[in-house]
Amino acid sequence: MTETTALASSTASSQPSSQASSQVLSLDLIITCADGLEAPLQTELTSFGIASEIKSTGRLAVTGTLRDLYKICLWSRVASRVLMLIKRKNINAEYDVAEQLYGLAKSVNWTEQFSLEQTFAIRLSVDKRVAVSQQFAMLRIKDAIADTFNEVYESRPNVDSKNPDFSVFATVNDKQAELYLDLSGTSLHRRGYRVAMTEAPLKENLAAALLYSAGWHKKNEAGDTPFYNALIDPMCGSGTFIIEALLMHCDYAVGIDKAANQFGFYEWQHHDAALWQEMIDDAQTRFRAALEIANEQPDTLPLIFGFDADNGAIIATEKNLIAAGLQDLLPLLDIETRALDQLSTLLKPLVADGRLSNPLIITNPPYGERLGDEEMIKPLYQSIGLILQDSFAGSGIDPMLGILASHVEQVDILPIREPKTLRCHNGAITVYFRYGTLIAGQTGNLVSRFEKREIEVEDGQDFINRLQKNLTRLKKLAKKDNVSNIRVYNADLPDFKVAIDLYGDYAHVQEYAPPKTIPPETAKKRFNLALMGIREVFGINREQIFIKTRARQSGNDQYSKQGNTEKRGKFYIAREDGAYLYVNFTDYLDTGLFIDHRNMRARIKDNSRNKSVLNLFAYTCTASVHAALAGAKKVTSVDLSQNYLDWGKQNFALNGLNVSSNKYQFVAADIFEWIKDNTEQFDIIFIDPPTFSNSKKFQGTFDVQRDHAALINRAMNRLTADGILYFSNNFTRFELDEQLTERYDIIDITQKTIGFDFDIKKPIHQSFEIRHRQSL
């Protein structure tokens, strides 16, 4: 059988000089790393001037000197362990494998590796194709080492399985067995700076590997300044990305903290203490010099931004920065409590004045295990992309974006150009790192891009002319108010009874059921002409048009799922006044966003800062989102439907709002019962009830004309003395109860809440501002 002995012999007691030792010993090393990090580790080793070969998952082979060994242990940010090959031997798996391992271990002179006074432990990895008791095989390797020492000293070193001075690693497959000595000691990922923790932290060497993958280590073409001028982590947790990025920039040897007593080679017979101390001194000098330059010339330090919605995470980050020896840089960093929804407000001025000319945005969002609610993960990742696109819109800057996720589908929705994906592990969790340049956000929408032109369509010319006339007028108003979701046609012509609403780049077309006097084939022909006209006027394809037939509603039809529809179950994103909102064009009669209440939501937003807000009949919580984005101190959304509240939660997450925060409550309950039993007071209350409801979830029915007075009276009991209640409804024949006007100060604000795209002479809704009557 073939045997290979990897370590050249050397006289241990002589402690050779630094130069001699590095020349005498030729070491066959295996550098281990977490699965998936082989390429970043190889990049790092190459930067050290050390050639390597990827042998298998998580293992790189290096043939090097003692200096190379020390350099990897001292400087590698990605490696997990450094194993030195002691001996390798071919085996026959059909024979007694445990005894073959004994023979292999017995052929090694262990007294040349460590002394009698030191403890050791055995670690064994066995291929599943090999039939052997792992425990017994480890025992036989231990026996071989003990027998070797007994033959020389008539005594043997002790075994310490928990905290040994040396760990002997053995690997066995169906053809070969190998013995290694662990010279790194404790895992190299431990830096020593993690004194404060947050939930599910990122391992240090994984963070470093991802920074390598994203190119943080690169310099500009001249080689004298960093390639990136800023690093932004919008959900920094305990600050691992920030700290690892700073340690890279400041030329910090991450093994310095372990240099006191934690390396496995300290008691090794071939350890060269003089060479090691020389390398430690050099590393410390380099770090001090880099810190001095950063403090004296702050412009040489990239801008560093670390944000988290959890103040505890920010405190942890600052503590860890100090523990990492970076306390002198704290005044130069922007580490603050800031929720994701506030990110764009900070970034836009920095982009505008050129301070973010080439940033790296890298983060580890609270995916899966950290977030806890799977339904919130997709909106969270979408919100990151949307907020960043908004922040860099029109700047000409293409930032690098790198984001971790627990499932690759989560990062598939990120707007990244030519994305790369790294599959790796954060501890036991498989994660995916998606990185690449951010795709610039689309500018404009169907309204803003509309240009009037000559279009000739037989039998449909009147419709096209009216639609273009409407759009010519609406385009100017939409641009003035920055509106992209509007109604552009509402049965203006008797022969074309449709309503056309635009949501960004999509057309939502509702066909009113024709009267019985119109033959079905005539109605169908006219509707098809309208669809053709819509495509011609907007220059859009069939996939951008969604069709519904609208008949007289009864009960809860407005909120019920539709039957024979196309493209079911897909949500699209509409933007309104700085908010992102999910809309569904197929599954329900309504889309999830009532565009006729656009001005009402703006009014609520303008009055919500530092206020407590209650949204009754909250539906998909669009008004609640606006209140939260405006800085409301608390927002409570109440609706009978849990499904719509879940939709509302996703709207919150889509805007970077933390639905787990105590600031935001989502309550599935009967409105009348809830406001009767709840005693909390609110500064702003919004009520937009259905015209009629007969839901099975509560007894009886709700009729807005019949029941609005009782509803408002109960709600006013929950309104603070100087608060405002906004009441709105879409019942065309609605009349406000006179007793309410006698009891409260009420202002009809319908004219102010009807948008420019709706007919004020035939208001689609009525709205009122209601306050407590003040005593004189």
From Swiss-Prot:
It is found in: Cytoplasm. It catalyses: guanosine(2445) in 23S rRNA + S-adenosyl-L-methionine = N(2)-methylguanosine(2445) in 23S rRNA + S-adenosyl-L-homocysteine + H(+); guanosine(2069) in 23S rRNA + S-adenosyl-L-methionine = N(2)-methylguanosine(2069) in 23S rRNA + S-adenosyl-L-homocysteine + H(+). SMART domains: THUMP. Keywords: Cytoplasm, Methyltransferase, RNA-binding, rRNA processing, S-adenosyl-L-methionine, Transferase. SUPFAM superfamilies: S-adenosyl-L-methionine-dependent methyltransferases (SSF53335). It is an enzyme of class 2 (transferase). Its EC number is 2.1.1.173, 2.1.1.264. One of its GO terms (molecular function) is RNA binding. Specifically methylates the guanine in position 2445 (m2G2445) and the guanine in position 2069 (m7G2069) of 23S rRNA. NCBIfam families: PRK11783.1. Belongs to the methyltransferase superfamily. RlmKL family. This is Ribosomal RNA large subunit methyltransferase K/L. It comes from Psychrobacter cryohalolentis (strain ATCC BAA-1226 / DSM 17306 / VKM B-2378 / K5). The gene is rlmL.
